[in-house]
From Swiss-Prot:
One GO BP annotation of this record: DNA replication initiation
Pfam hit, one: Bac_DnaA
Keyword Amino-acid biosynthesis recorded: no
Disulfide cross-links: none
Protein's UniProt name: DnaA regulatory inactivator Hda
Taxonomic classification: Bacteria, Pseudomonadati, Pseudomonadota, Gammaproteobacteria, Enterobacterales
HAMAP family: Hda
PANTHER family (alphabetical): CHROMOSOMAL REPLICATION INITIATOR PROTEIN DNAA, DNAA REGULATORY INACTIVATOR HDA
Self-association and partners: The active form seems to be an ADP-bound monomer. Forms the RIDA complex (regulatory inactivation of DnaA) of ATP-DnaA, ADP-Hda and the DNA-loaded beta sliding clamp (dnaN).
Protein family: Belongs to the DnaA family. HdA subfamily.
Length: 248
């Protein structure tokens, strides 16, 4: 089996070093912080995560949503906050596990924070399930690591083949990441725009929300495009300008 080791640098990149010395970078978005996360009805989850990463080593939180909804954003935010403080953190996106081998989890129990994203992606993979189960047990035994895990459904609804892993994931604090209403999506876009130094008028927000895919990732990508276009054209965002840029 191909051996692989995980290294994390504090600029927010996970590096996988193989025996061939090939490095595979997985960049963490530098704009996905707690400040840029619009919590809506998820304030209690955000507070729980912040408490856990700063005060509760040995803690475990699982949170889920079916449509994205900001799970990865919160994991990136947690990693960024602790890594900037000089703590060792690890982020493993299991939807990209083609770049990893399960041994990537070895030794992570010595980090301050471990984030496992999209755990449903390893359902039915015996080797990965066992590796995660063993990591969970090591984290529990040492009691020095905060473990954050996300999925697209509650732990008991994931079709895991290892019953003990399903049981472990069902322990601790479990949250559903509540979806944003249309009004909250506009406010989330306005918050992101404000942090980038420009304004998204409410009428423009309503306009794009009615005409584009309403998934937040799509909307944020649209906001990036509008930000760039407005800088190049030296224009504020208006409905006619947005219609022209987005070809609506």
């Amino acid at each position: 089996m191909l051996e692989s080791r995980r290294l994390l640098n504090y600029s927010g990149e996970v590096l996988l070093n193989t025996p061939s010395q090939l490095s595979l970078p997985l960049s963490l978005p530098d704009d996905e912080t707690f400040d840029s996360f619009y919590a809506g009805e998820n304030a209690s989850l955000v507070a729980a995560i912040q408490t856990a990463i700063h005060q509760s080593h040995g803690s475990y939180i699982y949170f889920w949503s079916r449509d994205g909804g900001g799970k990865s954003h919160l994991l990136h935010a947690a990693c960024a906050e602790l890594s900037l403080a000089g703590d060792a953190v690890g982020y493993v996106p299991l939807d990209k596990r083609a770049y990893f081998v399960p041994d990537v989890l070895e030794g992570m129990e010595h980090l301050s924070l471990v984030c496992i994203d999209n755990v449903q992606c390893i359902a039915g993979d015996e080797e990965w399930e066992l590796a995660l189960f063993n990591l969970y047990n090591r984290v529990l035994e040492l009691g020095r690591t905060c473990l954050l895990i996300t999925g697209d459904r509650p732990p008991r609804q994931i079709d895991l083949q290892l019953p003990d892993l399903a049981s472990r994931l069902d322990w601790g604090q479990i949250y559903r990441l509540q979806p944003l209403s249309d009004e909250e999506k506009i406010q989330a876009l306005q918050l992101r725009a404000k942090l980038r130094g420009f304004e998204l008028p409410e009428d423009v927000g309503r306009f794009v929300l009615k005409r584009l895919d309403r998934k937040m990732r799509t909307l944020f990508e649209m906001l990036d495009e509008l930000d760039h276009a407005s800088i190049v054209a030296q224009r504020k965002l208006t409905i006619p300008f947005v219609k022209d840029i987005l070809k609506l």
